[in-house]
């Protein structure tokens, strides 16, 4: 049909399925979802976060302030597989270990075996890489387990996907007190973000809150529009050249695309979830973090990791505490 630009796909499996079509017909897929990295493609612009912008900042915080031992649970597909591998090697490099590594089929709601094992092992930290309804079921079951077992009162659950609409789905009894790594939270205290949230609610309802994926999709539309205007053409080569010269003042902060990898510079944040389905931002990067889809600079999985600086420090960017 002659379409040259498409904004879309959420899961990595869907992205990988359609990429050959974009390659065959020389189109450009604008992919707005965070993902597990280890990919670049001349026919894809990646505007969501990669590992050094989500799982590494979270794990650096956990390893420095909570524990070196991790209980891991995830959905049985590439997102959890790759992040599980990173976390396994990172904890080992820091003298810790994976207490357990468990996987459920996507959509599986039977978390009883996982909860039973958590009762037994009493981990200080649980890395939740479940997605969708499986994740919601886990949070609800864990909240009940924590109420029943005093040894789990201080156990922290971490996630790289937890967002405001999911907190609302989970419910106020189970959604509070969890650690999340994201480049966007709806509570970012800037005028641009406040305007974005207001406009979002006007469009989708008074109680609606945008997620990181909603913000990334919004940013992607603007980046595409700016690149098309700069190129004065839909030709993907000219559009990419124009894109690499532009930036967008997004709700999260300045966003621009790295010409070497076609991934995006994004502002990393950590937050703690609250009962009202929002997050308290507890730390954020001082500047947009360079994307590192192959972990070339972060060296997160090498033997020297335990002595090395954090990935953001290696990029001359540090997390500052937000009070």
Question: What kind of region is each of these model predictions?
Answer:
Residues 1-323:
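Extracytosolic ligand-binding ectodomains
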């Amino acid at each position: 049909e002659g379409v040259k630009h498409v904004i879309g796909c959420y899961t990595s499996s869907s992205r990988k399925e359609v990429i050959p079509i974009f390659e065959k017909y020389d189109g450009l897929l604008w992919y707005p979802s965070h993902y597990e990295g280890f990919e670049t493609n001349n026919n894809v612009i990646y505007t969501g976060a990669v590992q050094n912008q989500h799982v590494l900042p979270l794990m650096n915080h956990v390893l420095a302030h909570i524990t070196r031992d991790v209980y891991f649970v995830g959905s049985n597909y590439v997102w959890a597989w790759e992040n599980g591998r990173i976390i396994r090697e990172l904890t080992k490099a820091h003298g810790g270990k994976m207490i357990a590594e468990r996987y459920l089929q996507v959509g599986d709601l039977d978390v009883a075996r996982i909860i039973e094992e958590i009762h037994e092992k009493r981990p200080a930290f649980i890395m939740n890489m479940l997605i969708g309804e499986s994740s919601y079921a886990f949070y609800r079951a864990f909240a009940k387990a924590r109420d029943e077992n005093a040894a789990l009162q201080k156990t922290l659950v971490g996630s790289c996907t937890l967002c405001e609409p999911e907190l609302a789905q989970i419910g106020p009894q189970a959604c509070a007190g969890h650690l999340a790594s994201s480049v966007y939270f709806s509570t970012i205290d800037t005028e641009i973000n406040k305007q974005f949230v207001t406009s979002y609610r006007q469009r989708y309802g008074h109680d609606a809150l945008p997620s990181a994926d909603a913000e990334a999709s919004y940013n992607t539309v603007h980046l595409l529009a700016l690149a098309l205007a700069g190129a004065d053409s839909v030709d993907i080569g000219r559009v990419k050249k124009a894109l690499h010269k532009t930036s967008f003042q997004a709700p999260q902060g300045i966003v621009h695309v790295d010409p070497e990898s076609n991934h995006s510079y994004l502002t990393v944040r950590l937050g703690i979830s609250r009962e009202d389905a929002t997050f308290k931002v507890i730390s954020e990067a001082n500047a947009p973090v360079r994307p590192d889809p192959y972990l070339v600079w972060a060296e997160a999985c090498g033997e020297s990791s335990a002595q090395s600086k954090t990935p953001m420090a290696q990029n001359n960017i540090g997390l500052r505490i937000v009070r």
